[in-house]
């Protein structure tokens, strides 16, 4: 029996495009596929794209988020709400996070634009975003940390062990997409009029072009749907769930990451700093990024250089995601 061909587009038409807004047309689609494709893409666009946001702030003279600052109109809670709205675009590809100290005085208003001269790896996309209003006599000093992430992450999940006293962790809105709308219209192919046209409108914060955002969302869906291909469908799921299996490379990596740092040729100073921070194994060490290490008590650049050499020689990197090695399962 002959297999009926699906009507599907051979390309996506970009109707309008700027750095912030894009309108795209996708046609023809079989009846019902407008909703299927449109809803899936919209969900991924709004929840699963990477972006950059402030994850923590430390303000001089402030112990907690319910404090007030003399000479500043807004309380700390309001300042944090305003910091959450600041949008960033990465300027240097190698940088995923940055901690910066911001000092402002002689101003009646602190805006996100004041941050730019203190930040090297990121561009502030909404410099007019007001952070707080202040007396000109006030000198305001704060340290913010910018990190890469996906979607929305609550402050509780941003918390880090051994953070400096007075660090306030912030809800992070990483998603670079501000709004997504789609509509479905009838489309005619020859004599048939019940095919569909999918029209997509994407508004971004400027850190990613709408066209690139649509491409990334589609790739994410493709990677997930590939799991349903014939070679990935198996009857061994129950057995795998009962007995964890690892390939040779993963087993080697697990053993390496569980290596005690006291067994490494490290200086006494570096070992003492790490021990005080409860960093005992290579896995503990590489789970931190360099900025986090520099916040350890008595930890200096000489110790960082020593650890960078160790980590590099072992073929590892700082800030690694170790979840796939399941180090907590022995």
Curated annotation (Swiss-Prot):
Region of interest (Alpha N-terminal domain (alpha-NTD)), ranges: 1-232
Keywords linked to the UniProt accession: DNA-directed RNA polymerase, Nucleotidyltransferase, Transcription, Transferase
MF (Gene Ontology): DNA binding; DNA-directed RNA polymerase activity; protein dimerization activity
Pfam families: RNA_pol_A_bac, RNA_pol_A_CTD, RNA_pol_L
GO cellular component: cytoplasm; DNA-directed RNA polymerase complex
Entry superkingdom: Bacteria
Catalytic activity of the protein: RNA(n) + a ribonucleoside 5'-triphosphate = RNA(n+1) + diphosphate
Residues spanning the signal sequence: none
SUPFAM superfamilies, per database record: C-terminal domain of RNA polymerase alpha subunit, Insert subdomain of RNA polymerase alpha subunit, RBP11-like subunits of RNA polymerase
Region described as Alpha C-terminal domain (alpha-CTD): spans on this chain: 248-330
One GO-annotated biological process of the protein: DNA-templated transcription
EC primary class: transferase
EC number: 2.7.7.6
Subunit relationships: Homodimer. The RNAP catalytic core consists of 2 alpha, 1 beta, 1 beta' and 1 omega subunit. When a sigma factor is associated with the core the holoenzyme is formed, which can initiate transcription.
Task of the protein: DNA-dependent RNA polymerase catalyzes the transcription of DNA into RNA using the four ribonucleoside triphosphates as substrates.
Protein family: Belongs to the RNA polymerase alpha chain family.
Entry domain remark: The N-terminal domain is essential for RNAP assembly and basal transcription, whereas the C-terminal domain is involved in interaction with transcriptional regulators and with upstream promoter elements.
Protein name: DNA-directed RNA polymerase subunit alpha
UniProt source species: Christiangramia forsetii (strain DSM 17595 / CGMCC 1.15422 / KT0803) (Gramella forsetii)
């Amino acid at each position: 029996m002959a297999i009926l061909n699906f009507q599907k587009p051979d390309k996506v038409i970009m109707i309008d495009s700027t750095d912030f807004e894009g309108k795209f047309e996708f046609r023809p689609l079989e009846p019902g596929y407008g909703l299927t494709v449109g809803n899936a893409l919209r969900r991924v666009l709004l929840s699963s794209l990477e972006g950059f946001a402030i994850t923590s702030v430390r303000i001089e003279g402030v112990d907690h988020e319910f404090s007030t600052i003399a000479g500043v109109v807004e309380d700390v809670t309001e300042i944090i709400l305003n910091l959450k709205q600041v949008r960033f675009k990465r300027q240097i590809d190698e940088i995923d996070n940055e901690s910066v100290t911001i000092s402002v005085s002689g101003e009646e208003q602190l805006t996100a634009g004041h941050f730019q001269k203190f930040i090297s790896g990121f561009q502030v996309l909404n410099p007019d975003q007001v952070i707080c209003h202040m007396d000109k006599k006030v000198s305001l000093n704060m340290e913010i940390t910018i990190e890469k992430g996906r979607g929305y992450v609550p402050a509780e999940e941003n918390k880090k062990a051994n953070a400096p006293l007075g660090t306030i962790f912030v809800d992070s809105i990483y998603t670079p997409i501000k709004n997504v709308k789609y509509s479905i219209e009838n489309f005619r192919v020859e004599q048939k009029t019940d095919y569909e046209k999918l029209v997509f409108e994407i508004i971004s914060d400027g850190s990613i072009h709408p066209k690139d955002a649509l491409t990334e969302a589609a790739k994410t869906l493709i990677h997930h749907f590939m799991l349903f291909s014939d070679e990935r469908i198996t009857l061994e799921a129950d057995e795998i769930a009962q007995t964890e299996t690892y390939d040779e490379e993963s087993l080697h990596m697990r053993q390496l990451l569980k290596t005690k740092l006291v067994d490494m040729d490290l200086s006494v100073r570096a070992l003492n700093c790490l021990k005080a921070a409860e960093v005992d194994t290579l896995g503990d060490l590489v789970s931190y990024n360099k900025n986090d290490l520099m916040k350890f008590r008595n930890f200096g650049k000489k110790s960082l250089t020593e650890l960078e050499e160790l980590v590099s020689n072992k073929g590892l990197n700082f800030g690694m995601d170790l979840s796939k090695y399941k180090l907590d399962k022995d």
